[in-house]
Curated annotation (Swiss-Prot):
Lineage: Bacteria, Pseudomonadati, Pseudomonadota, Gammaproteobacteria, Enterobacterales
Name of this chain's protein: NADH-quinone oxidoreductase subunit C/D
Domain of life: Bacteria
PROSITE patterns per the UniProt record, alphabetical: COMPLEX1_49K
Catalytically driven reaction(s): a quinone + NADH + 5 H(+)(in) = a quinol + NAD(+) + 4 H(+)(out)
Primary residence: membrane
Span list, region NADH dehydrogenase I subunit C: 1-187
């Protein structure tokens, strides 16, 4: 049940933040003047350093006691049109490196300023191998060159793409581009660009004894779980190497955020991981609320948790059943869709929509809970535990499934952290990293629940079993929401709550004007930066927002868990069979919209 004594503010004040952070060690080693410390709404240090110090600082952090051993994110910002840059280093562009120390439960954001005439910086791959894909995406989106990168080529965009889409002077709308024509010559060029050339990836076509076969799995193979291609280098049935090919589902979600108001971007968040629903909205609205300095009522926190856990169960059921189907059993898929229908009925009764409610708001939720919501939730809580046993008895205890998945595609905790793995893949290595416990948000510190973990090695079977246990924990959280739903408003009484409470709009002319402006132009959010991570359905999802004091975001960075999970595939599956790859893909739990954004 919700424990009032557990409620606490998890943020540090500025003095505690500086004393307890890594800054003290960095200043001692590099000197007081090696960086500029930026004051933001972010709960951990944000520093600017010269690019000549990047690898030295990275090595210091990754090798220090209680090291910063995960590169969580890496991307760029076009600084040229940013108005509010007081006390920041001169920069036309910047790159940021987000590092996490597991032992410290602490982060640091390192920024490197770059001038337009010198957009070169050293690659970070020697310290963190998962920097590879992040650097490729940053290059193609901003034109920043990473020296000594092994393969600085397009990853999201097509090979023939011209221009750098996330630069501020690149058109954001299709109507701002020239008319598109696909003549025969251009069609031939695009088809040729899809041809896989092993030499470009450091692969040999043959060795002394055998000619390798190169096989396309996808981009429309049913076991690829979306528009996803993997090119396999094969010696018979054995995978010598492989190259994941992503980007087929890219829709420019981060670019769209620069053309939508803070309020009108909420529906777009649902489509990032299209099975997650309200879970996707959570980090975005929390990050905006930090910028606006909005505290929401306790009832809002509980409602948000309740909807998030419903969507978590819904996503996990689809994952578990499709994994079982990939191994060869059909029945659980039909069970899952029956169970998921009950969840959708409950979600629809509360929000008015099913998969993509766009229901969270800046400062609250769209409307209050309807009459009878508790009856529907109670019925579901009585139904689901009994049904969950069928999945285990029908399939997960089946000796054939166990032999097909235990010990397959396995990796340890160190490897998981190197590749930026989060979610059940990391927890099955024995590390209980769940943001709901480690860095509680939306009142998660007030709930009693456990974090299921594995025995030290993550394999296909352990990953799916962790998800089953997580459903039981989500059911426990939902019971606490049902039992302890507070009374009170469903929106914060704050000038930047969008839209304002309806009852005030109808009585107060000032509030009506505010409503009109916030819905049409959007709320004006103070200039600052904020960051929010959450435990999403597939791992850690986060939003890093930069406000320049306007009605729209200056920069919205969306870090999704599926992106690094697919990058890890070659390191895990080399030397295995094609049939093992199919099981491995089913065990990752990804959708391509989450990868490509």
């Amino acid at each position: 049940m919700i424990d009032e004594n557990k409620k606490k503010n998890t943020n540090l004040n500025k003095n505690e933040y500086e004393e307890k952070s890594i800054l003290k060690d960095l200043f001692h080693f590099f000197g007081k003047d090696f960086c500029v410390v930026q004051d933001t709404c972010i709960d951990f240090p944000v520093i600017w350093i010269n690019k000549s110090l990047l690898l030295k600082v990275g090595k210091f952090l990754s090798s220090s006691p209680k090291p910063y051993n995960m590169l969580f994110d890496l991307h760029g910002v076009d600084e040229r049109f940013r108005l509010n840059r007081l006390n920041l280093p001169e920069a036309d562009f910047s790159i940021f490196y987000h590092l996490i120390s597991i032992e410290r439960n602490s982060d640091i954001l390192i920024k490197v300023p770059l001038l337009k005439d010198d957009l070169n910086v050293s690659t970070f791959i020697s310290l963190f191998p998962n920097a590879n894909w992040y650097e490729r995406e940053t290059w193609e989106m901003f034109g920043i060159i990473f020296d000594q990168h092994p393969n600085l080529t397009h990853i999201i965009m097509p090979n023939e793409w011209k221009g750098f889409p996330l630069r501020k002077d690149y058109p954001a709308r299709a109507t701002e581009h020239e008319s598109f024509f696909l003549d025969e010559q251009k069609e031939d060029l695009e088809m040729e660009n899809l041809r896989f050339k092993p030499e470009l990836w450091g692969m040999k076509r043959k060795n002394d004894n055998v000619d390798f076969m190169f096989l396309n799995l996808g981009p429309n193979h049913p076991s690829a779980h979306g528009a996803f291609r993997i090119v396999l280098q094969l010696d018979g049935e054995n995978i010598v190497d492989c190259v994941p090919d992503i980007g087929y589902h890219h829709r420019g979600a981060e670019k769209m955020a620069e053309r939508q108001s803070w309020h009108s971007y909420i529906p777009y968040t649902d489509r990032i991981e299209y099975l997650g629903g309200c879970v996707n909205e959570m980090p975005y609205v929390l990050a905006v609320e930090k910028l606006a300095n909005i505290s929401v009522p306790e009832k809002v926190e509980v409602i948000r948790v309740m909807l998030s856990e419903l969507f978590r169960i819904n996503s996990h059921l689809l994952y578990i059943s499709t994994f079982i189907q990939d191994v060869g059993c059909m029945t659980p898929v039909f069970l899952a869709f029956t169970d998921r229908q009950k969840i959708y009925d409950l979600i629809e009764a509360i929000t008015g929509a099913r998969m993509h409610p766009a229901w969270f708001r800046i400062g609250g939720v769209a409307h209050d809970l309807p009459k009878g919501w508790n009856v529907l939730l109670k019925e579901f809580l009585e139904w689901m535990p009994k049904r969950l046993k069928y999945y285990v008895q029908l399939a997960l205890e089946n000796p054939i499934l166990i032999r097909r998945s235990k010990g397959i595609a396995q990796y340890n905790q160190k490897e998981a952290l190197q590749w930026g793995v989060t979610g059940s893949g990391l927890r099955s290595t024995g590390l209980d990293l769940d943001v709901r416990k480690w860095r509680p948000y939306s009142g998660y510190q007030n709930y009693t629940f456990e974090i299921p973990i594995g025995q030290g090695i993550s394999d296909c079977y352990s990953r799916v079993i962790i998800k089953v246990e997580e459903i039981y924990q989500s059911l426990s959280i939902l019971k606490q929401c049902l039992k302890n739903m507070p009374e009170g408003p469903f929106k914060s009484d704050h000038p930047l709550t969008t839209p304002p409470p309806k009852e005030r709009v109808l009585k107060d002319i000032d509030t009506m004007i505010t409503h009109f402006l916030q819905v049409s132009w959007g709320p004006v959010i103070p200039a600052n930066e904020s960051f929010q991570m959450i435990e999403a359905t597939k791992g850690i999802n986060s939003y890093y927002l930069i406000s320049d004091g306007g009605t729209m975001s200056y920069r919205t960075r969306i870090r999704t868990p599926s992106f690094p999970h697919l990058q890890q595939i070659p390191s895990v599956i080399r030397g295995s069979l094609i049939s093992d790859l199919i099981v491995y893909l089913g065990s990752i739990d990804f959708v391509m919209s989450d990868v490509d954004r």
